[in-house]
């Protein structure tokens, strides 16, 4: 029964891909982003910050922030929406605000409500040996986490879902040299994050969210079709669709996560 069910899942998923062509998606985003500074070097209780007055403290925090205080909400949201719309076309689905008094969510009329986006900036430490075994260095890097909460509808029932992704600095190269006193000095070449890089990341998110939304509706269709036929449905065999290779495959973690 399980093998038969797995085969049936893919069959119904391919059916969904065909039947969903021309579907209309109404996509909504929040008016603004929530921004949270979690950098440990910006904690006002740090010994180097607690002695500062309010103005000095704010100036110091602003100087240490890499991304958070530079984000233009409108730019971030607009590039994400445009990317979402373009990605939908790859699935033969269109962005269209179809809602009216005569139309409700159904198999060809979907709502993707991205109700909340939180962007956090924090510090990480990456451990590297810098090419000398036994000599390990902690390298300070910055991570920007983008967490998003969704409400998805293709019938009268709402589903609430979540996903998060990181925009990270990473080590390009790390090596030791010697100073004038013959002491080892660590040299680290970081791939730095930037505000332009974050907007490029928003483009990636728009494409990802379009794919995740399509996949959710596809799996919802598969679940309902199996239930009609009294076939077993396994949450562990979540399906994704690649519109470029026209291929359906299994995943465990690369998806929207339902919030109970």
For every predicted segment, state its role.
Residues 104-165, 170, 254-260:
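Surface-exposed short loop/turn segments
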Residues 6-86, 223-260:
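A structural "domain/chain start" motif
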Residues 93-105:
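Short beta-strand->alpha-helix linker/helix-N-cap micro-motif
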Residues 85-93:
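Sec-exported extracytoplasmic/periplasmic mature domains
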Residues 50-55, 128-135, 175-187:
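A subset of solvent-exposed loop/turn segments in beta-rich extracellular surface proteins, enriched
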Residues 63-70, 153-227:
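Short secondary-structure boundary motifs at beta->alpha junctions and helix caps
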């Amino acid at each position: 029964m399980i093998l038969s069910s797995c085969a049936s899942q893919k069959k119904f998923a391919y059916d969904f891909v065909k039947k969903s062509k021309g579907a209309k998606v109404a996509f909504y985003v929040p008016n603004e982003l929530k921004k949270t500074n979690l950098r440990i070097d910006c904690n006002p209780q740090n010994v180097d910050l607690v002695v500062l007055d309010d103005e000095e403290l704010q100036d110091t925090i602003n100087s240490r922030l890499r991304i958070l205080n530079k984000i233009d909400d409108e730019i971030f949201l607009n590039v994400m929406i445009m990317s979402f719309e373009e990605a939908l076309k790859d699935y033969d689905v269109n962005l269209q605000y179809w809602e009216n008094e005569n139309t409700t969510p159904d198999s060809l009329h979907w709502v993707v409500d991205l109700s909340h986006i939180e962007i956090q900036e924090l510090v990480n430490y990456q451990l590297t040996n810098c090419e000398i075994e036994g000599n390990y260095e902690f390298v300070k890097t910055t991570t920007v986490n983008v967490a998003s909460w969704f409400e998805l509808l293709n019938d009268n029932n709402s589903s609430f879902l979540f996903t998060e992704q990181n925009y990270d600095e990473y080590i390009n190269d790390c090596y030791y040299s010697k100073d004038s006193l013959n002491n080892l000095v660590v040299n680290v070449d970081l791939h730095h994050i930037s505000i332009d890089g974050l907007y490029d990341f928003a483009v990636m998110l728009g494409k990802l969210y379009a794919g995740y939304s399509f996949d959710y509706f596809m799996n919802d269709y598969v679940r309902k079709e199996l239930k009609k036929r009294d076939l077993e449905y396994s949450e562990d065999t979540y399906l994704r669709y690649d519109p470029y290779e026209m291929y359906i495959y299994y995943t465990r973690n690369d998806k929207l996560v339902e919030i109970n």
